[in-house]
């Protein structure tokens, strides 16, 4: 039951004659620990890092022939269309054209082939990809993790009472609210998950009285800043209530919140001012025009009096197909990274990031607050640290520094002089074997007993 006499309780009275219709949104009762299936990606990106644990040739070959999220998956449709168009033109040229028509076709192909260099694909694609990748990296580093804020709040906002606990939780939640509002406006998946602010409130990330307060603030611009303002005001409240000890602690938390807000501002600004449309249009037109002309210029001309007669009629343009895969794949990489807030498999999963930030942030400032393990002596106390791995599994190479090799050179020189003094001819192989044995079985006082990282 709701206590209407409680001043902290916000009661919204509605007329009895107005039917209240539930919003058409999904059930978020398990949120943030479970994303509804309808918002989960149909296909996830393929993580190939484990496949490249070693640089062996077999591993590289296996990586090249992976399908999911691969170059082949990106270009196979365009390649099939191009091969069909090329084959159709080839059949018409070989069997449907008259002799005079073949001559005109061959001259047209020769004319275009001589001028294919007018389309500087290497320069256009290289410069375009450079801009796109730099933009993508900036967006990636600006997505925002709540970890620093949560750790600073847990460390500096002290108190085990319910009031201090709620202050810590609300600071985290207010930061996540702003992140959710930003992602709602730029990420397709987040927008579908939270189509309205009421959906955000029903999910529990924003409370009903906070939604009312948020809507009461009138502004013609986006109100991403509101919940950050709440979080900073809570810091002042915590300092007034002696939950924060001094200005330094408050300023440290405020600085982390400011960094988080600045990163989200960067993401929002990049969405506001995209790369001019004419540039992606130019690159796409250049690549597709080039390979459209290749349908005619890369035909195998077989007429006896053709100026550019083909020496070997292979029927299938293998080199042009390879060129198509490389250039079209290059273009696909750029277009895949152009808008990382879409629904492609390799785009940013901002739904997961929101869930992760809320779950980890609240756990850090609440469940894990003041949960310090008992301080006991560690197992290395009073002794030197020895290698933790066994001799069988050890693959570390001990680093002694490049100048340490001078001692080894001096040792080899002394051994060589001993052999000469004994009337023996210096044997490089024997000297090398002695050097290896000395390194393996003797420990110099100047050599460390543990590898230096």
Curated annotation (Swiss-Prot):
Keywords: Cell membrane, Chloride, Chloride channel, Ion channel, Ion transport, Membrane, Transmembrane, Transmembrane helix, Transport. PANTHER family: BESTROPHIN (PTHR10736), BESTROPHIN HOMOLOG 5 (PTHR10736:SF8). It comes from Caenorhabditis elegans. Belongs to the anion channel-forming bestrophin (TC 1.A.46) family. Calcium-sensitive chloride channel subfamily. GO terms for molecular function: chloride channel activity. GO terms for cellular component: chloride channel complex; plasma membrane. Forms chloride channels. It is found in: Cell membrane. Forms oligomers. The chain crosses the membrane at residues 78-98, 113-133, 275-295, 314-334. It is a multi-pass membrane protein. Pfam families: Bestrophin. This is Bestrophin homolog 5.
